[in-house]
């Protein structure tokens, strides 16, 4: 679990996301409260429940990007899911308990990666012995092995092909039972049963350098205690797990509507116990959801937050509104983030030997076009900038291999020449921008 202060979390998010200070503060405080709770003792720790968050704002303003960046910062089991992927229990599709099962799998992968690092040195030695067995045979003399070991460590044998035995992937998707999402019966996965029956090794032909990571991971896994690993992962999910529920507005039941809305309301009802706190059976054991933090987000273009079930509204006590992007925000998005669009395009074309330069007037023109099209067609926020940039740089990207060594300067006139007319013609921009 990360021990960043709220101010440090916000400054990390500022490196990639423009504006939206309220949303950044809310998630920073929620993340810090996870750490604070773990410093408490016994009974009080159990009583402190997470304050779940509902983020409301139009599309393309940074809701999902905040989740993506938070996942990297959190150093905790984190899962982002779309609410529209799930159906009410009894309908064909995935039920919401699959969220927790998936979160457990994420946690196991995280813990395994961390523990592999602890046994890395021993795994490297064992993997090296397996490569030597493949090169000179298990019965070779110590002198021969030492000679090949030296060559192996200096990289002389990197391109040599060897045959190695690796673990065959288990579990086939064909063994799923209708109405049992993920092939789950209680806490047993059908896929796992068949995976164990067919858990054999297979021979693969690889170069020495390609086989290295595969063999090191296999040898590391042999040194790990799988039961302890799973227990640690479940503990991490129960105490530090974070679920980001995107598109929650799409499962709202709007006033005066009926028919296909039944399943939507059912999904909301199924989410209630999960967010409030329940026990979910997974193939690795029971998982309590009382202390998992849920962050829900939605554009709420058509539905309103009040269209959510009252019980669900009560379980998302912290409301954060994200603002629509202004012209100044668009301009900052093009230049300020560490991986801004302009930096990406400059780096991409640099690989062809083309140096791309953007004048301040070009950046202003790009922001103006994006804002104009958003206001006349459909407001899709910062995503409009990608469409505009692709259109402006279309000719340059196409001809870049023939223009190596050139320096191309983009100014306002160049932007207007490529997208100016389209931005003014609403009918055309509906289809092209």
Swiss-Prot record:
> What are the GO cellular component annotations?
HslUV protease complex
Keywords linked to the UniProt accession: ATP-binding, Chaperone, Cytoplasm, Nucleotide-binding, Stress response
Q: Which GO terms describe its biological process?
A: protein unfolding; proteolysis involved in protein catabolic process
Amino acids binding ATP: 18, 60-65, 246, 311, 383
Answer whether the UniProt record assigns the keyword Cytoplasm to this protein.
yes
The cysteines joined by S-S bonds are: none
Q: Where located?
A: Cytoplasm
Q: What is its main location?
A: cytoplasm
**Which InterPro entries does the annotation name?**
AAA+_ATPase (IPR003593), ATP-dep_Clp_protease_ClpX (IPR050052), ATPase_AAA_core (IPR003959), Clp_ATPase_C (IPR019489), HslU (IPR004491), P-loop_NTPase (IPR027417)
Q: Which residues cross the membrane?
A: none
GO molecular function ontology, one term from the record: ATP binding
Reported function: ATPase subunit of a proteasome-like degradation complex; this subunit has chaperone activity. The binding of ATP and its subsequent hydrolysis by HslU are essential for unfolding of protein substrates subsequently hydrolyzed by HslV. HslU recognizes the N-terminal part of its protein substrates and unfolds these before they are guided to HslV for hydrolysis.
Describe its partners and assembly state.
Answer: A double ring-shaped homohexamer of HslV is capped on each side by a ring-shaped HslU homohexamer. The assembly of the HslU/HslV complex is dependent on binding of ATP.
As for family, the record states:
Belongs to the ClpX chaperone family. HslU subfamily.
State the protein's name. ATP-dependent protease ATPase subunit HslU
Task: Please report the organism this UniProt entry assigns to the protein.
Answer: Rhodopseudomonas palustris (strain HaA2)
């Amino acid at each position: 679990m990360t021990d960043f202060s709220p101010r440090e979390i916000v400054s990390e998010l500022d490196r990639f996301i423009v504006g939206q200070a309220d949303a950044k503060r809310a998630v920073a405080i929620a993340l810090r409260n996870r750490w604070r709770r773990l410093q408490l003792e016994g009974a009080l720790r159990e009583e402190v429940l997470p304050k779940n968050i509902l983020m409301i704002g139009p599309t393309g303003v940074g809701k999902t990007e905040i989740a993506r960046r938070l996942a990297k910062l959190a150093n905790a089991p984190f899962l982002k899911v779309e609410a529209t992927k799930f159906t009410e229990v009894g309908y064909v599709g995935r039920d919401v308990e699959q969220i927790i099962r998936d979160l457990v799998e994420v946690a196991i992968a995280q813990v395994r990666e961390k523990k592999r690092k602890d046994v890395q040195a021993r795994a490297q030695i064992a993997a090296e012995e397996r490569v030597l067995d493949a090169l000179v045979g298990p019965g070779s003399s110590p002198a021969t092995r030492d000679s090949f070991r030296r060559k192996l460590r200096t990289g002389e044998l990197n391109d040599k092909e060897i045959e190695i035995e690796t673990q065959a992937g288990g579990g086939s998707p064909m063994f799923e039972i209708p109405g049992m999402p993920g092939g789950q019966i209680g806490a047993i996965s059908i896929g796992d049963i068949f995976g164990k029956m067919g858990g054999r090794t297979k021979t693969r032909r690889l170069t020495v350098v390609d086989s290295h990571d595969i063999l090191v991971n296999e040898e590391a896994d042999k040194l790990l205690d799988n039961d302890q690993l799973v227990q640690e992962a479940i503990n991490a999910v129960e105490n530090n797990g974070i679920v980001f529920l995107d598109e929650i507005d799409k499962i709202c039941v709007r006033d005066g509507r009926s028919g296909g809305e039944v399943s939507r309301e059912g999904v909301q009802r199924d989410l209630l116990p999960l967010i409030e706190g329940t026990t979910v059976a997974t193939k690795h054991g029971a998982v309590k959801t009382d202390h998992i933090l849920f962050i829900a987000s939605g554009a709420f273009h058509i539905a309103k937050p009040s269209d959510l079930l009252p019980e669900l509204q009560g379980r998302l006590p912290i409301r954060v509104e994200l603002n629509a992007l202004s012209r100044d925000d668009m301009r900052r998005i093009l230049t300020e983030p560490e991986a801004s669009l302009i930096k990406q395009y400059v780096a991409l074309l640099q690989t062809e030997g083309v140096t791309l330069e953007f004048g301040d007037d070009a950046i202003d023109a790009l922001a103006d076009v994006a804002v104009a099209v958003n206001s006349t067609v459909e407001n899709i926020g910062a995503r409009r900038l990608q469409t505009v940039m692709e259109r402006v740089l279309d000719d340059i990207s196409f001809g870049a291999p023939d223009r190596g060594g050139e320096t191309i300067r983009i100014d306002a006139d160049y932007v207007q020449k490529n997208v100016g007319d389209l931005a003014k013609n609403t009918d055309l921009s509906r289809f092209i921008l």
